[in-house]
């Protein structure tokens, strides 16, 4: 079932866009890779198998993969290229013990036209050809879809017609980050992202929006909603 009896015509997701209209953005797939070894006292490391050393080999392969990603996946004209980043590593229990476990977390940004699980499988195949010991690729704990501009063009134009009189000329753009717009769009509701403020201030210690831009955005939201029919 659905929560709404009538499907909305359009969703405008309020995020800081500098009053531009985001019509496309990248998605994200995140997962863990784990290596195992054999613990022993660090005074005789040859008695064990160092899981961090094993992970270092995987990290070198992932860096190689990230460098080649621009050739493997064509960049999107609005959102730029696909990326891969290792953002977290954890391993070992003490400095005098050879570690028997190591875990990393991977962030793979996908561009419109890519699927999250395909990106995961692509990395798995790349590592399989290069790594000769056992490791675990844990199923992704996040697969966030992209937002494509194939369904929202008409609505973006209509929203723009209310932006220009209030705030002057602005643009339809693509961005590297993701938003909830992709989830709404996946549900069959054409979606765009629009709001006051800059993404440069998002997730910082001092988030702020200028009063003028906030007032302009409020007027644009009102005019668009009042005339959407």
Model-predicted segments: where are they?
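Metal-dependent amide/peptide-bond hydrolase catalytic core
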Residues: 23, 30-229
């Amino acid at each position: 079932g659905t929560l709404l009896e009538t499907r909305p015509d359009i969703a405008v997701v309020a995020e800081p866009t500098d009053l531009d209209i985001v019509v496309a953005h990248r998605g994200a797939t995140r997962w863990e890779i784990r290596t195992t070894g054999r613990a022993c006292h660090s005074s005789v490391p040859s008695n064990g198998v160092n899981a961090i050393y094993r992970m270092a080999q995987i990290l070198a392969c992932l860096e190689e993969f990230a460098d080649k990603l621009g050739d493997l996946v064509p960049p999107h004209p609005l959102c730029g290229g696909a990326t891969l980043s290792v953002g977290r590593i954890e391993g070992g229990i003490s400095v005098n013990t050879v570690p028997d476990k190591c875990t990393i977390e991977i962030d793979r940004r996908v561009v419109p036209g890519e699927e999250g699980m395909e990106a995961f499988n692509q990395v798995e195949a790349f590592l399989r050809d290069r790594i000769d010991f056992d490791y675990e690729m844990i199923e992704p704990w996040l697969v966030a879809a992209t937002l494509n501009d194939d369904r929202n063009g008409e609505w973006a134009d209509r929203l723009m017609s209310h932006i220009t009189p209030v705030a002057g000329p602005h643009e339809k753009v693509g961005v590297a980050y993701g938003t909830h717009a992709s989830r709404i769009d996946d549900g069959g509701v054409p979606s765009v992202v629009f709001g006051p403020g800059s993404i440069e201030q998002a997730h910082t210690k001092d988030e702020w929006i200028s009063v003028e831009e906030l007032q302009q955005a409020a007027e644009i939201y009102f005019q668009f909603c009042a005339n959407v029919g």
